[in-house]
């Protein structure tokens, strides 16, 4: 059972809001799959982990990332048991060059599980 499940469109420059408010110290897992097209050419395809090998891009471009408090974090095909470094809402997005999202299409399917909430001893 996931805390959030949905699609992350490749053409959403501001990403997809999950509505999940995370706190520093929470532990989450994220799993993603699917294919998106991020350009006009027929070789510009990417999975959450990045572009197909015949069209290499800089390491952070054409990948799935999380944004929390305006800081980006690599997600790719998924992360397991990761500690959230900052407080904020979890936004998921396809990382592309700003201003170039208009020719993107497709979406990733993503599931997010909040495994534990940070609760320090008092």
UniProtKB/Swiss-Prot annotation:
Can be used as a fluorescent probe for the specific detection and visualization of the alpha-Gal epitope present on porcine tissues. This epitope is mainly responsible for hyperacute rejection of porcine organ transplants in humans during xenotransplantation. An alpha-D-galactoside binds at residues 44, 57, 96, 103. Keywords: Calcium, Lectin, Metal-binding. SUPFAM superfamilies: Galactose-binding domain-like. Ca(2+) binds at residues 38, 96, 100, 103-104. GO terms for molecular function: carbohydrate binding; metal ion binding. InterPro entries: Galactose-bd-like_sf, PA-IL. Homotetramer. Lectin that specifically binds alpha-galactoside-terminating glycoconjugates. Shows high apparent binding to the alpha-Gal epitope (Gal-alpha-1,3-Gal-beta-1,4-GlcNAc terminating glycans) as well as to Gal-alpha-1,4-GlcNAc and Gal-alpha-1,3-GalNAc. Gal-alpha-1,3-GalNAc may be one natural ligand bound by PllA both in the nematode symbiont and in infected insects. This is Lectin A. The gene is pllA.
